[in-house]
Amino acid sequence: MSLTPDEKYELITRNLQEVLGAKMIREILNERDISLYWGSAPTGRPHCGYFVPMMKLADFLKAGVHVTVLLADVHAFLDNMKAPMELVQHRVRYYEIIVKSILKSLNIPIEKLRFVIGSSYQLKEDYTLDNFRLAASTTEHTARRAGAEVVKQVASPLLSSLIYPGMQALDEQYLGVDVQFGGVDQRKIFVMAEEVLPVLGYKKRGHLMNPMVPSLAGGKMSSSAAANAKIDILDDPKTVNKKIRSAFCEPGVVEENGCLAFLKYVSFPAMELRGETEFVIDRPEQFGGRMVFKTYEEVEKAYKDLTLSPQDLKLGLESSVNTLLAGVQEQLKQYPDLDSILKAAYPDPKDLKKAMKQKKQDKKNAKKAGTTNASIAAESGAAPATESQTAESFKKLNLDD
């Protein structure tokens, strides 16, 4: 049964924190299905927070949205070198595998998705020229403010942190979409995009924003969070249970509660995808026995009323997370080279430091051997200068005068 434009809009926007351009999105839906992109910069190892945007991708696909997943490798490098160039390509591959495996585990047909690697178009002439045009029409203050909640903040920021937001705006044009989807932490970049694209002669896009799900320790969940504040996609049940049991979970308090937030934005939507209708907490009989909830609202009310304790909430969450991860890890068995990809993408810090040190030494050795200039000349198509040519050039300068 096909959905009406209003039904599609409701499905597209449910569980979102904010929508920019709602009127425009509705107008497009009255004529055709919308196109949208979600971008992810391959920096730290993917964690359970990635289930949150995946649930929305499921909603988008169900609503007939044409979805593009951008693996933003150039952005990963620009973000204060979170992903060195030596590692970024390996991380792109690892992220792609993880995203596809999460979606498959949720029975979301990935055939309807388009995967694009940022460097496949961001290094081309037309994109580069537009990037210069954007830079010439955007103030440093605007770019810095736009990336404040997304780009890593350091005492002495690199110039790359100012390039990052503008490229994210340009991606909307070069991916040919109507809408960009991301976390509410991206809001300032989205607003910048709405301002700068029309200046370049391109149309303004709509923007959909997910709430930021708190980590297990409270605060924003991210790949750079402390290891015990996030659950890795590859964590085993014992590790998952240990992390959840140590989570910050104040009795009766809903705000900044990472356990409740995960249930709301991941567990219950996942149950819907699997056709399940009950969230079950299997307490031992001596502690009250089994608890059954039909909706997230029932769970939240019980927690507020203190009829559901933090310990029992965590017990139910452990089961939910382990079920989700078991499905993903089963899909990952299709990739026999996963271990080697993971090691290449996230090598031991000691090994990485050793490799970088060796690379630096190799450059020094090459310079001493006089090969550096020859390599540069060869790459540019010019022949290396001979000693006699160099002497002749100095003569022409008339240095004695």
Curated annotation (Swiss-Prot):
GO MF annotation: an example: ATP binding
Please tell me the species this chain comes from.
Schizosaccharomyces pombe (strain 972 / ATCC 24843)
Q: Which residue ranges does the record annotate as region Disordered?
A: 352-401
Catalyzed reactions: tRNA(Tyr) + L-tyrosine + ATP = L-tyrosyl-tRNA(Tyr) + AMP + diphosphate + H(+)
The record ties this protein, via Gene3D superfamilies, to:
HUPs, Tyrosyl-Transfer RNA Synthetase
Q: List where the motif 'KMSKS' region lies.
A: 220-224
What the record says about family reads:
Belongs to the class-I aminoacyl-tRNA synthetase family.
UniProt-recorded name of the protein: Tyrosine--tRNA ligase, cytoplasmic
Pfam families associated with the record: tRNA-synt_1b
